[in-house]
Amino acid sequence: MADPQAFCVAEERSGHCAVVDGHFLYVWGGYVSIEDNEVYLPNDEMWTYDIDSGLWKMHLMEGELPPSMSGSCGACIHGRLYVFGGYDDKGYSNRLYFVNLRTRDGTYTWEKITKFDGQPPTPRDKLSCWVYKDRLIYFGGYGYRRHSELQECFDVHDASWEEQIFWGWHNDVHVFDTKTRTWSQPEIKGGVPPQPRAAHSCAVLGNKGYVFGGRVLQTRMNDLHYLNLDTWVWSGRISVNGESPKHRSWHTLTAITDDKLFLFGGLNADNIPLSDGWIHNITTNCWKQLRHLPYTRPRLWHTACLGKENEIMVFGGSKDNLLFLDTGHCNDLLIFQTQPYSLLRSCLDCIGKNAIILKSQISLLPPKLLQQVLKKITFWTAANYRKEQRIRKEETENNQPRVSSC
């Protein structure tokens, strides 16, 4: 009988932060809907997922805690998780926090960065971040500016004339140097920048920061751009060969090799949650849709991180349109294989799936290999248990009587 406590999973959520460092996936923040109320997840909790054993664990955090938020931008440099911006009960944020993920005693302590040079971006959420040369490079997002701060890099959505505050979408670029703790806004040297936007996606390949899609006003986009992170020149909209993904926001873009990007999910222009996956090859300048993905499991405002063997780990997000039916937050982990696994990984998976049959032989393995096998057995035991629980939950939901409106 499986122990439910041992196979616990991080709570359902959307708009959270997630990064991979070493053998672990780290998840913090976000929100969930409870009885039609948006509830932020506790700011003093971080969940870790052991990629080898498939086990989740919750850690209580200390230090200068960020507020409980959604729409923050999380990025990892040298084992430190940096969280910038977001939205909480008090409004939009432009504060920057970090936590060391490589602690020896398992204690995670937040630090708020208050001593820095330069000017940080204006408060915003749903922005993106490129990590390049120990720098955090932020682009876009939705937030507010005062009348004196209005520039061409801002599309106004709403305004409070009494307070001289304007809300809208950004397309500005800001850099935080983690070594010198300095904020700067680089001078864009050329090219046509993307429209202001939020809920877009980004990824880094080489010295280029790619941007895809997002929303401005009532328009969702499917344009692809890159910014040269050395010369600060925009590419302009990239004309691709062949078919392209649909217009969308709240999707993810992940670098999977030196020349390929993986795009998944989002909300399309018709407000329909998406479950499609695409790979963009920057060498051939072509998109290719993956046909083997589970189309019954759409996701939006999720996170997608690259694992040790180039698998994509998608966690959380919503399966519903957050703008109208905000109930379908998820906590299952979708793993998409983008290339063949190593021979060792394939063998470990085979043993893990057939542990009962191979029980008498497993104990004969060398100690180092035995440890890997035992973790993989735990991985598949946990995966099967969670699958059974998910099926039962779906059957229960499907069998509930529906109330029809007259």
Curated annotation (Swiss-Prot):
The yes or no answer to whether the keyword Translocase is present is no
Question: Where does the source fall among the domains of life?
Answer: Eukaryota
State the Gene Ontology terms under molecular function: ubiquitin-like ligase-substrate adaptor activity
**Does the entry feature the keyword Cytoplasm, yes or no?**
yes
Describe the function of this protein: Substrate-recognition component of a Cul5-RING (CRL5) E3 ubiquitin-protein ligase complex of the DesCEND (destruction via C-end degrons) pathway, which recognizes a C-degron located at the extreme C terminus of target proteins, leading to their ubiquitination and degradation. The C-degron recognized by the DesCEND pathway is usually a motif of less than ten residues and can be present in full-length proteins, truncated proteins or proteolytically cleaved forms.
Q: Which PANTHER family match?
A: KELCH DOMAIN-CONTAINING PROTEIN (PTHR46228), KELCH DOMAIN-CONTAINING PROTEIN 1 (PTHR46228:SF1)
Q: What is this protein called?
A: Kelch domain-containing protein 1
